Amino acid sequence: MRESFYILFPIPTYPPPPYGGAVQADGITSANTVGYSGTAINAGQWYLVGVQFADVASKAETADFNSLISTTCTPGAIGDFSDPTWGNAPMIQVLKANGQSYTYYYYISDADDGNGNYTATAWVDDQGFSLTAADVQALSKGFWFKSHTAGTLTCAGQVSTLSEFERNVPGGQFEIVANPYPVALSLNAPTTSGFTPGTIGDFSDPTWNNAPMIQVLKANGQSYSYYYYINDADDGNGNYTATEWVDDQGFNLTGTQVPVGAAFWIKSLTAGKFTFGL
């Protein structure tokens, strides 16, 4: 894969929130359940999108952007190595394994159609080349999306056939995680293992202390909601002995915290694992 070494932001601080749509049955033929989630895209805004679908009939449960995504946003020109965000093409940024920089993809109308004609409208890499097998995205990953024009973003494909899905999270760096199933997520719904619970931060600096931390973009697009993994949460009987995710004041979580089609940031001093289930 051809990768740029330029960073738009090391770890985004205040990007706009994602907007996930409901999942419905699709007309695609498949032995497995097929669905989609839709997002209304505003011009010039960032969206954090969760990968919750794979290519139809994919045994590896992966997808590339040309099969995963369809968009009505206007294709454009890609950036260059002096500034990969310079052009006006819709852009995807995928966090690299180092948790510090991104790989860039662009939506253009003069991509190679496979026959040497540069007339295809497609996602390409940061040099304008067609995507390869190295560019596929796995379920439970996430990516940033931005377009200079308004439109819609639809993620569609095969829903995971696994009744349980494990996602490993490295220690000591930020990671983007998405629910692998196309439903809204309560952070305490998946089984959490490996993470060392700690002490939450405070309002002067919510990242200050040592508890594993999740950040979910708020609907206002200006700030995050913070959640922490601690071992002195209320067990429901007034005993502060439960190990679970809590809000930034240490209170138990209710409802769901991550919308359909969205993803979230997590950082933990120790490596851990989420086990998602249906």
What is the meaning of each model-derived region?
Residues 102-139, 225-258:
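A cross-kingdom feature marking solvent-exposed beta-strand/loop segments within repeated
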Residues 76-79, 99, 114-116, 201, ...:
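Small-residue-biased low-complexity repeat regions
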Residues 92-94, 104-106, 123, 145, ...:
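Fold-core signature of tandem repeat domains
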